[in-house]
Amino acid sequence: MKKLYFYALSFLAVNTLIGANLADSSQIKKQKEGTPPPLITPNLTQSYFPENQFDHSRRNEYFFVTDKINSAMSPFKLTSGVYNGSFYGSALTQMRASNVYGALNFGYTKANDYKDGAGQKVGFGYKRKNGALMLGLVPNELNELKFTYLRDEILDDKQPQHGMDSRKTTRDIFKFDARLGEENLDNTLSYGARYRKIRRENDNYSLRQVPSAAMMLPLVKMKRDIWDYYLKYDLEFSRHHNQIGFSYENDDHKGYRYKHNLNAPDMQNAFRVPDVSVDRYKIFDNFRVTIDEQNAILLALAYEINRAKANANDTALNHGNFPSPRKIYQRYYGVNFDGKVDQEALSAELEYDFTPTSTQKYSLNLAHIERIGDNTERFSALFNPYIFNNPTTPQEKKMFKKMFKNMWGKQMNIGNPFLKNEEHNFIKLGANLKSENYKGYMNSLFGDAYEFGGELLLDEVKNLIIYDRLQRDGAFIVRNVDARIFSAKAYSKYNFNPNFGAKIDAIYTYGQNKTDARALYQVRPFEVNLNLDYKDYFSLGTYNFGSNLRAVSRQSRGDFDVKTGLGIDNKESAKGFATMDLYAGLNFKDKFGMRLGVNNIFDKKYSEFISGNHVEALAPSVVNAPGRNIYLSFHAAF
């Protein structure tokens, strides 16, 4: 039975670590995301803190003795808690037998309004239902099959930083993964398939009061269906390892904007995504050369062919009163787009690992990673018809000037089908050192123990894809610029004895738009986190208590001015701040536990510099994080 569980864990590791190509472009993220929150997977569900896009404290990394309950391989587990007036609960059942293992999980979140540090109410909230079903079959040591289904539904997700709310988001994910061969990947074929069904609806009237019947009521609906397949083969020979693979993805993406009418059918007046279909073909190879016990080199290559077609490129709406995406792209980028674009990307990464002892590891990475723009960056065709039609007569110009003053840049987000590949050329240095008796934070074999390390990254980016404003009419456009990105991370963890520990980490990031000689937008400020923790035993189990001090410096560099750039950054949110959390936990013999804490104990009023990202809000308003608040959760394993 233990061996079967090891199969399941190793199979997961294969698909998340070794199975991921080192040179894959997915490691590069957009400068500003606008997507639903991450999925709540079964391994996270029992220790999960309700997600708040306006509070970036990393409370999921705090030490709690209840984690042992949450991670135990028990047949049935429950958690339920109240977090600052919001509720989260989850149930998980899991099983394993001689040739089969599985898990079933359900979760529910009801997030409500909260007050900031000044006592002001913040219009925050959502309802979320999540679930997962996983079944694994291990007929023998050379075969494993795994079936997974994930469901995530988010309703009434308020977006106080944006002009529209996300009234409904659903994600259904079906996965099949299989292994044929040795589980240690000596001679193994892995293959699988995945289907993702994503639906979203955003509007400005379902969750907020409409001030006037004459107010524009936009409704955006998005449908996306993604099929992908992969095949990869691993071979171990003479202490070396090679993995070669192929993947194919078909992405069907539709997004429509409507003018909502109270007493008539909704009328489509723009394309968020003009019926885009994308075929992505990838081949990749990872080759690891083990020179000796201390030295190893890994070379990774990835080649991608991306063929995209905007099927509604020539579709004019409302009997031609609203122009087609082709005409919109031509107006803003001056090139006639035929609806098709084929791009190729070649990426490579070289990693050198030096492991002088079992407690030391150093790494050096040199990479050239290319990212092709996503569907919204390349094909969004949201526009304002009042601004699109140039005025000609004096009366039209007068009316246009009056409307332009109030509608500058609104409802206009124009993708760029002619974007070049984003090319990241970076060097990365990493180090990790620990004592021989260090098993983890607050976990030592004996006496005191430590771990510390860090990472330095310098990235010279050619053709970084950014959003910008067109000063003519305020429209959001997408363009390429050259940029420099630098980041430094450091961490240290020290267990003074079996009962007491401390950890500290710091991160600094610098981003410069070299083409325009200005700062990149949405670059996180310097931040330090310090945790002090204590744990001990009592007659019925264990307990812990701890504190976290989070200090964020003032961000002096940003894209603050709509007259010279995008203007997405806000000076009010660029102020520095410091907050403190206190927390504690009880564990009764690994069967029942409680987790409680007080966040922002000094009731500090502040807002995060990195704005909310559940939707693509390119002109966000300031939303303050929660003030002082309390949480209490219960955890059980049967």
Where are these regions (language model features)?
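C-terminal beta-signal and adjacent terminal beta-strands/loops
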Residues: 19-23, 35, 39, 49, ...
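Short strand-turn segments of transmembrane beta-barrel domains in outer membranes
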Residues: 37-95, 104-106, 120-124
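Transmembrane beta-strands of outer-membrane beta-barrel pores
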Residues: 48-50, 80-84, 97-99, 108-112, ...
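Transmembrane beta-barrel wall of Gram-negative outer-membrane proteins
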Residues: 84-110, 119-155, 165-188, 231-239, ...
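Membrane-embedded beta-barrel scaffold of Gram-negative outer-membrane proteins
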Residues: 100, 190-204, 355, 361-367, ...
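Flexible loop and strand-edge segments within Gram-negative outer membrane beta-barrel domains
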Residues: 111-118, 122-128, 142-226, 255-259, ...
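Outer membrane beta-barrel strand-and-loop segments of large Gram-negative receptors
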Residues: 132, 218-222, 226-232, 276, ...
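Gram-negative outer-membrane beta-barrel transporters
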Residues: 293-294, 306, 445-462, 478-560
